[in-house]
Swiss-Prot record:
Self-association state and partner proteins as the record states: Interacts (via extracellular domain) with flrt3 (via extracellular domain). Interacts with rnd1.
Protein name from the UniProt record: Netrin receptor UNC5B-a
Region (UPA domain): 688-836
Disulphide-bridged cysteine pairs: 72-133, 84-131, 177-228, 261-298, 265-302, 276-288, 317-351, 321-356, 329-341
Localization (cell): Cell membrane
Species the sequence originates in: Xenopus laevis
Pfam family, one: Death
Domain Death: 863-941
Signal peptide from the UniProt entry: 1-30
Length: 943
């Protein structure tokens, strides 16, 4: 090994460098440069191979003014030179070493140069300072990779420093930190009271990819001083300290028992107290609001002592020479604990002034016999009372046993009847209402059918109203004699036929509560729902299936708006899952709504449950909420294996523990899920101004050979699956859709939906509706428990020759919006039905596999993720992309993912499955200043 800085070698090298720098000549082959100007005196051997680099120069940073050393090593190599920024480095700046490899016997040449801060600063242009080695052998030249030399620095000021805050106990706290700009990029760590926070040891802390600190659930022990520390090879910077105070708001203890009335007689007060100690306010928490004590007026009846009346007159003188007088203790009678009268009730004295002929002995015997007879009477009276009490007890026990036997007997009869009839119990019991001036005879009831021909549950008359619409149960019942207007209902199920609670009748529900149609239905369907969850039958009419692997894909339910997007990498490599989507029939499912909630979407099961997913999948379901109004409390619910519904997330109330993310659009909800299962979207109104969208669809019979002609007006939720269900039902019943359905905005105002028919040509037709209008009760619509609600208008033509009908049907919510249908129907055999899904017939493919399911090519997607996943001090990273794509409602969900950009792009795929317009994504990237990504999309997208 020796150094090549010797005078003879320097002269030869200088000549070589001068020739190279002064000549502009093309290389003969790729990868061989300047080989034709090398001196002939260089040794070469035809058998030699191209130089191979054993050590290539690495990226380096200049700290302060200390130069960096770049080293490369190659064999076989006759010469090695450095080239920096396209210019050859002077040979005098090279330090060359060489040795013979003990194994191969080849000469290993090593070259080293130094790069100073001045050289790097003198470079002009956008490109960083770079160097690479060029090695020569007799076979040609080889270039090493480029190594970049940068001046290391770390600015003093943070782009954003954490700010102190006060946070309530068990609430989430976010401390933001953007480290100062530096080269190389600074590493960030957080200090809590000068101790390093390690999220792996304390899982209550989370440091996001953009260096923010999240306290998931603030504890009292988290009250501390927090500091953001940024460091690289140059320096270490500390932010200002942010003080986090975890406060506890005061809470009231339970009320004490009411104290005794403070006045033993007359008007007084009772008092009870509570204390603000459950918990006590801490660290500046608010005091309890409300009264610390309550008073209650009490009135204690004063005790009244008894008083004697006047003595009665003396009785006649008896044979014992004694007469009597008496008095009573009722002047006043003792009350409220007052004392009884003291003294004798009876008074007696001798009435002969001592002239009585009986001696004292006879008189004493008489008194003794009188006392004995009195004792016998008391004994006999006690025995009679005891016998009477025993008889009463025996009678009571007998009555209880008798009633219990009767109840069991009735239950057996009911169960047997249900077994024989399949659970279908027609009930004709109705209660007349004489307090309503608008009532007419029950036989004049319009047709209001829900799930006609599908549901086989118990049926009950809800109201005997003429101008309002009572609800019965199933169109499979034969109509009563002379009953021309029929009424049906699918979800009014009672526990015992013929027995009704007055509060459940139409129009008698108290303000502020809804009749619990779905609660009545849930009692019947809970066991059925449990079996449904376990077996999950695959009915082709309401389910679709597909098999997917690690490349992902999309499963679509045609004409329903329901789909499941499985991103690439969601299924483990080498695994294949058969996945399915199923729309659950509401009559067979426990309903998710409770109280004043309303169902806003179909109940969807995606499965199978329990799958191991590496990434979230996106479930898309339609909904019928008008989200332009801000009065909604919207929730996503899931059904447990026990059949109960549980809240998954309330929109705009997400925390780090929320397992999913919902992207709400005007007609659909796209949900990122880590677990498959049964889901539904429900809503509730804040202040009775929320609005849900309904579809109004009118059907007529395809063929009419009688004088009667029925027009059915369906009122269903504005979701594709609801209309699809009605179309399939009417197809089986021989009906057709007269014209395109219309939209109705239905407000949570307790007002019913009113339907009426007008402008009938009375010379040819007459209406058999005796009332002016029909009504569908508000809560039947709002609860969402009844899927195919409708009213029927029965018309009669005077002659079979009348084959044309024109009329108007008006549908509106009382004190709300409405729609008017101008109908013109022909009673012909070849009548054509309006098909709302005709434009979607082409898209009947249910499964798209691998790359065919995604709009963004995988190569473009990877480059976008690599560019945006890492946090940027200028903010043009994945957070800005989410903002540009309107997906920034809760960024912390994406921050917890390994690739936030990838999850955002998956959600974009779900939102744009119909249009797939990459221009929207390109526009967002352009606005972010990511023009290089647009170039990638233009080049790779054309391939």
């Amino acid at each position: 090994m020796y150094l090549s800085r010797n005078p003879s070698g320097a002269a030869l090298a200088a000549i070589l460098v001068a020739l190279i720098l002064s000549c502009n000549f093309p290389s003969s082959t790729a990868g061989i440069e300047y080989s034709d100007v090398l001196p002939d005196s260089f040794p070469s051997a035809p058998a030699e191979s191209l130089p191979h680099f054993l050590l290539e120069p690495e990226d380096a940073y200049i700290v302060k003014n200390k130069p960096v050393e770049l080293v490369c090593k190659a064999n076989p190599a006759t010469q090695i030179y450095f080239k920096c920024n396209g210019e050859w480095v002077n040979q005098n700046d090279h330090i060359t070493k060489e040795r013979v490899d003990d194994v191969t016997g080849l000469v290993v040449r090593e070259v080293q140069i130094e790069v100073s801060r001045q050289q790097v600063e003198e470079l002009f242009g956008l490109e960083d300072y770079w160097c690479q080695c060029v090695a020569w052998s007799s076979a040609g030249t080889t270039k090493s990779k480029r190594s970049y030399v940068r001046i290391a620095y770390l600015r003093k000021n943070f782009d954003q420093e954490p700010l102190g805050k006060e946070v309530a106990l068990e609430q989430e706290a976010l401390l933001q930190c953007r480290p100062p700009e530096g080269v190389p990029p600074a590493e960030v760590e957080w200090l809590k009271n000068e101790e390093i926070i390690d999220p792996t040891k304390d899982t209550n802390f989370l440091i996001t990819i953009d260096h923010n600190l999240i306290i998931k659930q603030a504890r009292l022990s988290d009250t501390a001083n927090y500091t953001c520390v940024s460091k690289n090879i140059v320096a270490k910077r500390r932010s200002t300290t942010a003080t986090v105070i975890v406060f506890v708001n005061g809470g009231w203890s339970s009320w004490t028992e009411w104290s005794p009335c403070n006045n033993r007689c007359g008007h007084g007060w009772q008092k009870r107290t509570r204390t603000c100690t459950n918990p006590a306010p801490l660290n500046g928490g608010t005091m309890c609001e409300g009264q610390q004590y309550q008073k209650f007026a009490c009135n204690t009846m004063c005790p009244v002592d008894g008083g004697w009346t006047e003595w009665s007159k003396w009785s006649a003188c008896s044979t014992e020479c004694t007469h009597w007088r008496s008095r009573e203790c009722n002047a006043p009678t003792p009350k409220n604990g007052g004392k009884d009268c003291s003294g004798m009730l009876l008074d007696s004295k001798n009435c002969t002034d001592g002239l009585c002929m009986q001696n004292k002995r006879v008189l004493g015997e008489t008194k003794s016999r009188l006392l004995e007879s009195t004792g016998d009477v008391a004994l006999y009276a006690g025995l009679v009372v005891a016998i009477f009490i025993v008889i009463i007890l025996l009678m009571a026990v007998g009555i209880v046993v008798y009633r219990r036997n009767c109840r069991e007997f009735d239950t057996d009869i009911t169960d047997s009847s249900a077994a024989l009839t399949g659970g279908f119990h027609p009930v004709n019991f109705k209660t007349s209402r004489h307090d309503n001036s608008q009532l007419i005879h029950p036989a004049m009831q319009p047709d209001l059918t829900a799930n006609a021909g599908i549901y086989r549950g118990n049926m009950y008359a809800l109201q005997d109203s003429a101008d309002k619409i009572p609800m019965t149960n199933s169109p499979l019942l034969d109509p009563l004699p002379n009953l021309k207007i029929k009424v049906y209902n699918s979800s009014t199920v009672g526990s015992s036929p013929g027995i009704h609670d007055g509060n459940n009748l139409l129009g008698t529900k108290p303000t502020g509560t809804y009749p619990s149609d779905n609660n009545i239905m849930n009692a019947r369907n809970k066991n059925m729902s449990m079996q449904h969850l376990l077996t999950l039958p695959r009915d082709s009419s309401n389910s679709v299936t597909g098999t997917f692997g690690s490349l992902g894909g999309r499963l679509t339910f045609p004409n329903t708006g329901v789909s499941l997007l499985i991103p690439q990498g969601a299924i483990p490599q080498g695994k294949y899952y058969e996945m399915y989507l199923m729309i659950n029939k509401r009559e067979n499912t426990v309903l998710p709504s409770e109280g004043t909630q309303t169902i806003l979407s179909p109940i969807i099961t995606c499965g199978p449950t329990g799958l191991l997913l590496c990434k979230p999948v996106i479930l898309t379901v339609p909904h019928c909420a008008d989200i332009n109004t801000s009065d909604w409390i919207l929730q996503l619910k899931t059904q447990s294996h026990q059949g109960n519904w549980e809240e998954v997330v309330t929109l705009n109330e997400e925390t780090l523990n929320t397992p999913c993310y919902c992207q709400l659009e005007s007609h659909s909800c796209h949900t990122l899920l880590d677990q498959l299962g049964t889901y539904a979207f429900v809503g509730e109104s804040y202040s009775r101004s929320a609005i849900k969208r309904l579809q109004l669809a009118i059907f007529a019979p395809m063929l009419c050979t009688s004088l009667e002609y029925n027009l059915k007006v369906y009122c269903v939720e504005d979701t594709p699956d609801a209309l699809k269900e009605v179309l399939e039902l009417e197809k089986t019943l021989g009906g057709y859709l007269v014209e395109e359905p219309k939209l109705l905005m239905f407000k949570d105002s307790y007002h019913n939906l009113r339907l009426s028919i007008h402008d009938i040509p009375h010379s040819l037709w007459r209406s058999k509706l005796m009332a002016k209008y029909q009504e569908i009760p508000f809560y039947h619509i709002w609860s969402g428990s009844q899927r195919t609600l409708h009213c029927t208008f029965t018309l009669e033509r005077y002659s079979l020759a009348a084959t044309e009908l024109t009329c108007k049907i008006c549908v509106r919510q009382v004190e709300g919006e409405g729609q008017i249908f101008q109908l013109h129907t022909l009673l012909e055999e070849n009548v054509k039905s309006f098909d709302p899904f005709c434009s979607q017939a082409e898209n009947s493919v249910t499964t798209h596999l691998g790359p065919y399911a995604f709009k963004i090519p995988f190569s473009i997607r990877q480059k976008i993720c690599n560019s945006l996943d890492a946090p940027n001090s200028r903010g043009n990273d994945w957070r800005l992309l989410a903002q540009k794509l309107c997906m920034d409602r809760y960024l912390n969900y994406f921050a917890t993912k390994a690739s936030p950009t990838g999850v955002i792009l998956d959600l974009w795929e779900a939102l744009h499955q119909d249009d797939g317009d990459l221009n929207t994504l390109a526009s967002a990237l352009e606005e972010m200043g990511k023009s290089e990504m647009m170039l990638v999309m233009a080049t790779d997208g054309d391939c």
